[in-house]
Amino acid sequence: MIERGKFRSLTLVNWNGFFARTFDLDELVTTLSGGNGAGKSTTMAAFVTALIPDLTLLHFRNTTEAGATSGSRDKGLHGKLRAGVCYSTLDVINSRHQRVVVGVRLQQVAGRDRKVDIKPFMIQGLPTAMQPTQLLTENVGERQARVLPLNELKDRLDEMEGVQFKQFNSITDYHALMFDLGVIPKRLRSASDRSKFYRLIEASLYGGISSAITRSLRDYLLPENSGVRKAFQDMEAALRENRITLEAIRVTQSDRDLFKHLITEATAYVSADYMRHANERRTYLDQALALRGELFGSHRQLATERYRHVEMARELEEQSGASVDLEADHQAASDHLNLVQTAMRQQEKIDRYQGDLEELSYRLEEQTEVVEEAAELQAEYEARAEAAEQEVDELKSQLADYQQALDVQQTRAIQYQQALQALERARELCRLPDLAADNAEAWLETFQAKEQQATESLLTLEQKLSVADAAHSQFERAYQLVKNMVGEISRSEAWQSARELLRDWPSQQHLADRVQPLRMRLAELEQRLTNQQNAEFLLNEFCKRQGQQYQAEDLEGLQSELEARQEALSLSVNESGERRMEMRQALEQLKQKIQSLTARAPVWLAAQDTLSQLCEQNGEALASSNDVTEYMQQLLEREREATVERDEVAAQKRELEKQIERLSQPSGAEDSRMIALAERFGGVLLSEIYDDITIDDAPYFSALYGPARHGIVVPDLSLVRSHLETLEDCPEDLYLIEGDPQSFDDSVFNAEEQANAVLVKSSDRQWRYSRYPELPLFGRAARENRLEALNLERDTLAERYATLSFDVQKIQRAHQAFSQFVGKHLSVAFDTDPEAEIRELRQRHTELERELSRFEEQTQQQRQQYTQAKESLTTLNRLIPQVTLLLDETLIDRVEEIREELDEAQEAARFLQQHGSALAKLEPMVAVLQSDPQQHEQLQQDYETAKQSQHQAKQQAFALVEVVQRRAHFSYSDSAGMLSENADLNDKLRQRLEHAESDRSRAREQLRQQQAQYSQFNQVLASLKSSYETKQDMLKELHQEMKEIGVRADANAEMRARERRDQLHEALSANRSRVNQLEKQIAFCEAEMDSLQKKLRKLERDYYQIREQVVSAKAGWCAVMRMVKDNGVERRLHRRELAYMEGGALRSMSDKALGALRLAVSDNEHLRDALRLSEDPKRPERKIQFFIAVYQHLRERIRQDIIRTDDPVDAIEQMEIELARLTEELTAREQKLAISSKSVANIIRKTIQREQNRIRMLNQGLQAVSFGQVRGVRLNVNVRESHALLLDVLSEQQEQHQDLFNSQRLTFSEAMAKLYQRLNPQVDMGQRLPQTIGEELLDYRNYLELDVEVNRGSDGWLKAESGALSTGEAIGTGMSILVMVVQSWEEESRRLRGKDISPCRLLFLDEAARLDAKSIATLFELCERLQMQLIIAAPENISPEKGTTYKLVRKVFKNHEHVHVVGLRGFGQDVPATQLISDATA
C-alpha cells in the first residue's frame, strides 16, 4: 500500500510575533490554541501563503468579515510581517519518503500601497536532521541571529552536497512541481485552478458551507468529461486538425506570400539602390576621370584659343588700319565719281547749251533778216496805206468839194484849179519851171525813169547795206567766237588769236583723238599698278603667315617646295584618314561586341545565379551540361526511392491510425457493433464497467476475463435469450455475463493469481490460463496509455512521413528547377564569362580610343599644316603670275607719265568739245576779222539818202502822174465845157474813190497782216534773243561750275572713276568682311574663351564635387560593403544583372518596390520606421539596415516547427513544399469525419451514468458523518430535463435534424447549440455564441444538477443551507463536502502523477470552538479514516488527548512583541508520556 505524503512542519521566520518558529504538524490534527490575537490566524496565513503564493487570491480576514466585499488594504498579509526578509516554509515527506521544503520569501515593499513581494522556492535533498530555522537564519551571537536573504540562502545550499535549490518565477511552475512531488492534490494549470484550490482552503479555514463551492460543485467534484471530450475529439479531431491545417496553410501561405513579397520587394528595393549606387560610384569614377581629362583638354584648348585671339587681334588691328585708309580712298573715289558724274552732267549740259546756242544763233540771224524784211515790207505797206488813205481822202474831199459846186463851171474851175495846183506841185517837186500839161507826160517818163533809177540805186545801196550788215554780223560773230574761246580780247587782236586757235586746232584734235587710247593705256597701267599693290599686299600677308620675308624672285622656288610639302601632307592626311577609318571601324566592332556581350551578360548572369543556387541547394558542383543531366537522373532515382519509402511509412501510419481509432472507441469497445448490442440487450459493456481501473490492474483483469473482456454484462440472461436468434450483425464470439452493472465485481470467476498470469477455473474440467498481456488494453488508463504510445509512434511516423514528403517535394522541386534551368539557361550557362570578355574588350576599346585620340591630334595637326600649305600654295599661285609686276619698278613713273599725257589730251578734248563747233564756225569766217567794217554808217547814210531820193523821185513821179492825170482839167478853161466835165469828173471820182477805197482796204489789210507778222517776227526774235541770252548766261555759269568742279569730263572718266570706286569698294568690302569675320571670330573666340573659362570653372567645380562625391561615396560604400559582408547579404544584393540597367530604370524599380513595401510593412512599426529611415537618399546604408531588418524579421517569423532553415529565401522554398504536404494531410484528415450524433449522445449518457456511480460511492463514505443533529451528508445528481431531451433527440431522432449536422458552414458544436435552441425555444441564450453554447453542451457536467443534502433529525433529508443548520453543523457539513472534493481531485489526478505518489491531504478550521466535542471527534475520525491532516484553531484546548496542541500566548517585553509557544502531544495516542514541546521564541 502506498503511504500518503504528510506535511511535517511549518516554519515562520520574521513574522509578526514569530522570529524563527517551526511548528511540527501532527499526522492527523494540529490544534492552535490561544486567546484573541495570539497568532493562530497568522500561523494559518503563513501556511496558506506558502501553499498558494498568489497575491491576487490571498485575502486574510477575520471571521467577522466573512462575506465582506472589502477588508484591510493589505488584504491581511502586510500587517502580519515584520520589516526585512520573511520566510514561510512547509517541510513535507512525500510517498517516496523524499523530504521537500517548499516555501516563500516575503518582504514588505515600501509605500502607501502596503504591498508585499513574494518569491516561491523549493529545497530538495535536505538532510533530515537539519531544521528549517537553522537553514534560514544565521547566529551572530549567543542570543542573536539574523535572517538570511534569499541569495545567501541559495549560496549556503549550493555549498551542501546533494541539496537542490530552485527558485520559481512562475506560480504555475511552483505548483506543477508541488503536484509532481505529491504536495497538492490537483494539478493547478491555470489561475482558475488556483482560485478553486484557494477557495477550498478558504472555505475550510473559515468553516461553514461555502456558497462559492456549492454553486460550483460540478467544477469541483466532477472531472472533465474525458470520455465525452475524447469522443468529441474523435468526432472533431479531423475537423480541428483540418482547421489547424487550414490555418497552417493560410499562415504558411501568408508567411510564404509575406516572405516572398517582402524578400522580392525588399531585394528589388535595396538591390536596385545598391546596384544603382555601385553603378553611380563607377559612373562617378568615370565622370571624375572624364572631367579630369576634359579639364586638361580645356586648359590646352584655352591656351590655343588665347594664342588665336592674340593673332586675330593683331590681324584685326592691321585690317582696321587698312580699313580706315580704304574707307578714305573709297570715299575719295566715290566723291571723285560723283564729281566726274557731275562734270559729265555739266558737260552734257554745256554741250547741249552750246548746241542750243549755235542753233539759236542761226535762228536769230535768220529771224533778224526776216524781221528786217518784214520791217521793210511794213514800211512799204505803211506808205502804200498812207498813199491810199490820202488818195481816198483826196477823192472824198474832191467828191465833197464836187458836191459843193453848184454848177459845172465851178466844178471845172475847181478841177482846173486842182490841175494847176497839181502842175505847180509837180513843178515844185520836179523843179521844172517849164513843166506844162503838154510836156508833163514826157517829163513823166523822164521822172519815171529817174524814179526807176533811184529805185535801182536804192536797191543797190540796200543790197550793199545788207552786205555791210552781213559783214558786220560775221565779224561780230567771229569776234564773239574768239572771245568765247580766248576770253576778253581787243578787236584788233581777234585776228591773231583766231589764227592761233585755228593753227592749234589740228594738234588739239590729234590730242583729243588720243584720249581713248591714253585712257585705255592708263587704265591698263593703273590696273597693273593695282595688281602690283595687291600682289605686294599678298606677299606681305604671305610673309607674315610664313613668319619669314621672301623676295619676289624667291617665290618660284618656294612654290615647288610648298607643292612637295603639300603632296607629302596630302598623302599623310589620306593615309591618316584611312587609318582613322580603320580604327573607328575597329572601335565600332568592339562596341558592337560589347553591346552584344552586354545584352548577353544579364542572361548569362541569371543562368549563373540559377546554377549557383542549384549547386548550393543540392551541394553538387555542376561543371557542364552532362553533369546537369546526370544529376537530374540521380534526382529521379532519389525521388523514386523516397516515394517508395514514403508510401511504406504512409501504410504504417494508416495501420496505426486504425489501431488508434479502434482503441478510441467509446467504453473501450473495439467493435462498434458491441455498443449497439449492449443498448439492445439493456446491458453494459464489461470494458465500460472496468473503464476506471488503474493501469497496474489492467493486466490482471485483462487476463482474468480473457476473451470475455469484450463481453456484455446484462441484468438477466433469460431476457436476452429471445434476442439472440434474431441477431444478424454481431461478432463471431459474443460473451454475455449476468450481473448488476452498478455493483459488478469479479466474483463470477474462480481464479488464482499467479506470477504474471491468471488461472481461471471455469469448471472442474475446464481451466483457462491467461498470461498478463505485454500491452494491456483493458480499462481506460491502459487504453490511454497504449493510445499515448501509439500516438507517439504515429507522431513519429507522421514526422517521418512529413520529412519524406518534404524530401520528395524537395526532390521534385529540385528536378523541376533543373528542368526549368535546362529549358531556360542550359544553352548559355556554361558559356564563357561575358563580363570578362567585356572587361578585355573595354580595355582594348579604351586603348584604341586613346590611340585614336592621339592619332586624331596628329591628323588634326597634319590637316592644319596641309591647310596652311594649301593656303600658302594658293597664295603663291596668285603671286607667281604677278612676279613680273612685283619686279616692275617703273610702273608708277609710266602711270604718272601717261596720266599727264591723258590730262593734256583730255584738256584738248575738253577744249575741242567746248569750242570745236566754234572753231568750225570760225574757220570760214576768220577772214572777216582782218578788217573791222567801220564804213557801215556811211553806207547807211547813203542808203538813207538814196532812199530819200527814191522817195522824192516817187513823189515827183506821182506828182507828174497826177499832172498827167489832170491834164484834161487844163482844158476846162471855158465855162461851156465845165458841166460836161463835172459829170464825167463825178463819175470818175466815184470810180476812183471806189478803187481807192478798195486799194486802201487792201493796203490796210496787208499792213495789218504785215504788222501782225512783223510783231510775230519781233516776238520770235525777242524770244530767241532772250533764250540766247539765257542760255548764254547758263553756259557761262556751267563753264564757271566746270571750272569750280575742276574735273575733266571725258567719255571714259566716269567708267574709270566707277571702276576705281568699285575696286576700292570691293577691297573695302573684302576688308570689312575680313574685319567682320575677324571680329566675329574674335567675339566667338572671346565667347569661346569665356565659355571655356566658365567651363573650366564649372569643370573644376564639378571635378572637385565629383571627387568629393567619389571620396564620400567610397567611404559610404566601404561602410555599406562592410555592413553587407558582416551580415552576409552581399549575394542577395549584388545582382550583377542589374549593373546593365539604366539608373532611371533602377530608380523606377526601387520606387515601385518602395511603394509596395510601404503597404507591406504598414502594420509593422519596426519595419515601417526602418523603411521610412531608409528613404533618405543620402544614407544608402540605411537601406542595407532595412534589408537586414527585413531578413531578421523574417528569420524570427520562420516557423521552426515546419521549416528547417534560417534563411528566408530558403524558407520560401520549404514553404512551397510544406504547403503541398499540408494540403495532402488536409485531404487525408477530411476522410476521418465519421462519427454520428447518436454516438456522442451515448458517450455523454454513459459518462453521466459513470459519474453518478462515482458520486454514489462518495456518498457511501459520508453516510456515517455526524455533526449535531446531522446524521448524514450526501450529494444528489440529476439530469436536467432540457438536456435529457437533447440526448433523446440525438440518440433516436437525429435523422430529423441532419440539416444541422450535415451543414458545411456549422461545426458540430454549433449544430448542437442550434439543436438545443430548436428544442428549447423558451431558453434565453443571451449574447453567447453558438460555438460557446455547443462546447458547453458537449460537456457532460452541464447536463447534471448537484445538490448537497443533510439528514437532520426528524426533518429527514433536506437541502444543506447555512440558514437551516447550526454553525457547528454547517462547519461539519462544509468540511465533509471539502473532503469529498479533495477525494474527487485525487481520483481525477491519479493518472496524471506518478503511480508511487499519494498526495498530502490537509485542511484548516479556524475558530473550531464552535463545534461540540462529538463533532470534533467526528472530525478526528474522518481525518483518521481518510488519512487527512487538519489544522484547527480555537481559544482553548479541544480534545487534547488526540493530535498535537500548541498553546500560543502573545507577550510584550520591553516594547518587543513575541509569541510564546508551548506544544503538547496528545496523551491518548500510542506515544510515550506527554511530551512538552515548549520553546520560547525571541
From Swiss-Prot:
GO terms for molecular function: ATP binding; DNA binding. Residues 666-783 are annotated as: Flexible hinge. InterPro entries: MukB (IPR012090), MukB/SMC (IPR050308), MukB_hinge (IPR032520), MukB_hinge_sf (IPR042501), MukB_N_dom (IPR007406), P-loop_NTPase (IPR027417). It comes from the Bacteria. Residues 333-665, 784-1116, 1209-1260 form a coiled coil. Belongs to the SMC family. MukB subfamily. Homodimerization via its hinge domain. Binds to DNA via its C-terminal region. Interacts, and probably forms a ternary complex, with MukE and MukF via its C-terminal region. The complex formation is stimulated by calcium or magnesium. Interacts with tubulin-related protein FtsZ. This is Chromosome partition protein MukB. The lineage of its organism: Bacteria, Pseudomonadati, Pseudomonadota, Gammaproteobacteria, Enterobacterales.
